[in-house]
Amino acid sequence: MVSWAHEAPTPGSRGAGRTKDMAIIGIVAVDRNGAIGKRGQLPWHYSADLKFFKGQTTGNACVMGYKTWLTLKRPLPNRLNVVLTRREGVEARESVVWLRDRESVLSLKDYLKCDLYVIGGAQVFRVFLGEIERWVVTEVPLAVEGADTFMPAGFLEGFRAEDTRRLEDDLKVTFYARAV
């Protein structure tokens, strides 16, 4: 069983057992036009990118919107699944936390001993734009016809590329950090 949480801090302890601050990282795959979805689904399938996503996010927390949650067949394994929703009566599940707003997610900072990956969808990316410290962006070599969900314009403004890695011949991922 993966443990994501520190012991609850006591008054004055400032996060008992913390070894590092939680980083908030956006992770996304985008086509040439910034598309991330079509009819509520990821409009491509690249095994190398899915494997990369799993490697990056395993052992961490992943925050997603309810629509993204619905596209999953089950909770992402070995990750704390944080689902943003205002819906009532959602089913309790192991390794899934249901939260209602951005502030509730940010309050996890005092308790998590892992990073928080913002994994989508578009509304959730918009909500956390000001909080994301780093981006991990897979560039999909397509222009998806009929795409209906896009990344917010300028989401990488104020960030600089630090590293690029090839996942496949035509698929690359770029790591961005907030410019200081």
Residue ranges of each PLM-predicted region?
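Residue-identity detector for glycine
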Residues: G12-G17
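Enzymes that bind and transform nitrogen-containing heteroaromatic metabolites
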Residues: R18-V180
